[in-house]
Amino acid sequence: MEAALWGLLGTIAGAAASIATTVIASRNAARLQSTAAAIEREEKARAFQRETLIELQDALHDELRAVALVYMADEAAYRESGAWGRRLLGEELNNRVHVAGRRTLLLSERVADDDLRGHIKSLRARLTELQMARDVAVAERAHEVAMSMGISVMEHIGQVLRSLYAGQRA
């Protein structure tokens, strides 16, 4: 009977060890899978931000260019009439400004970096100020500030973009 008892105890101990090993392996596999899923989600978010920022650079460039054309049109009209910002924009330029501004606005709201979003909002406020100016001195100053700020925002986008590449796992 003693041999049978030892056999039974050995079988029970072996089964318990096997169950414990399976539980530990399952927990580790679940933890690894969870970590891999988190890394994948993080990389998808990083890729989305990279794509958004690259599109935003193009959109912002288009908006800056369109507003500069508005400034030049106002300048030409001022030379003819002596009044700043009183002439309506042509339909094509008006649409160009509208589409460029809309695209910049939509893309900027997708940006995760709060500082960058705030910087873009400040720039867009200066661009609006430039377009709405009714005085040549105000318009010239707004143009100078907006174009300088545009360069600064482009550099800020570049910094955020580079940080997203630097944050990749090797």
What would you call each of these model-derived segments?
Residues 1-13, 17:
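Short hydrophobic membrane-inserting helices
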